[in-house]
Design a protein with these regions (language model features):
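Outer-membrane pore/translocation modules
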Residues: 1-37, 90, 95-98, 151
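Outer membrane beta-barrel transmembrane domains
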Residues: 40-45, 49-152
Length: 152
């Protein structure tokens, strides 16, 4: 099935713009990303738009909290891979893509886990707000993101 492929093996272009500003003790951010296949193979994942808006509040140097709203719109798969012809819904290119709106809350805390002075550990809980997926796709549930950052 297409969802189990590591890539569509196409040359892709991702362009975006990010704006971050400060208002009082808050950081406000917006980001727009567009992803498309330039050199298409027999099949490619559909064009994708991502829009993120967030607010972040720092509490001292070591702790921050954030809230984020994310919108994603992805077209269905273009083309067909003749080696993916199993009689299952995941082999149908029309069962991919759609629109999703997520809401996330997160926190970031300074750390010296590996002895550095500029390390952070971040975590974010992502909850689906609205899902309009194409074809026969399972609804998404919550997800948890854990990240580590080091600034050199």
């Amino acid at each position: 099935p297409y969802g189990m492929q590591s890539s569509d093996r196409s040359r892709r272009l991702t362009v975006g713009i990010t704006n971050v500003s400060t208002l009082g003790g808050y950081r406000l951010g917006n980001q727009l990303l567009f992803d498309t296949a330039l050199a298409k193979k027999s099949w490619t994942y559909g064009d994708q738009w991502n829009v993120n808006s967030w607010v972040q509040r720092d509490f001292g140097h070591d702790l921050s909290f954030s809230a984020r709203l994310h919108y994603k719109s992805q077209q269905s798969i273009n083309g067909r891979d003749v080696s993916i012809m199993a009689p299952v819904q995941t082999a149908n290119p029309d069962n991919y893509g759609g629109q999703v709106v997520d809401f996330a809350v997160g926190m970031s805390v300074a750390s010296n886990m590996f002895g550095g002075n500029h390390e952070k550990i971040g975590m974010e809980l992502v909850l689906p707000v609205k899902q309009n997926k194409r074809g026969l796709q399972m609804e998404s549930n919550w997800s948890f993101i854990l990240g580590y950052e080091i600034t050199l």
